[in-house]
Amino acid sequence: TQDSLADDPTIKSLTAKIAANPDDVSALYRRGQVYASKGAYALAIRDFDDTIRINPKDVEALNNRCWARTVAGELQAALRDCNEALRLRPNFVDALDSRGLVNLKSGATKNAIADFDAALKVNPRLTSSLYGRGLAKQRNGAAQEGALDIANAKAMDPNIVREFESYGVR
């Protein structure tokens, strides 16, 4: 709830910093991350909006806003953010992973597979990309290949299924 968020000591401290200096980009970004980690996506997006307004080339903030928008179901806006992050930093593994999730949620399975493949080339142990690619492969008709990716991802992180369910992906 909004009240428990306001009582969170980290959020309180960051909010005080932002009140003292509304352009404290690092406090805005950090508070956005905390909001996102607590499932307060609208508040996270607002803080990432402010971070990006101050620093339009902040690829981390663009990626985090992409991810938060994806989980919140704002898929077109999310895709724009991920594309911009990747334009500014090609092969940015976090943005490839996030864009894979956008494409998976929007039903663009071939694009999702391409993004997850690219992310896994950079970091072969990226569980979210492995699991996402498995789901995308299954939805694209490659049931056995998909099942293998999913099994490997679950072996690396048994919580991956719950994590994706929390993103609205089953």
Language-model segments: residues:
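Alpha-helical tetratricopeptide repeat
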Residues: 1-170
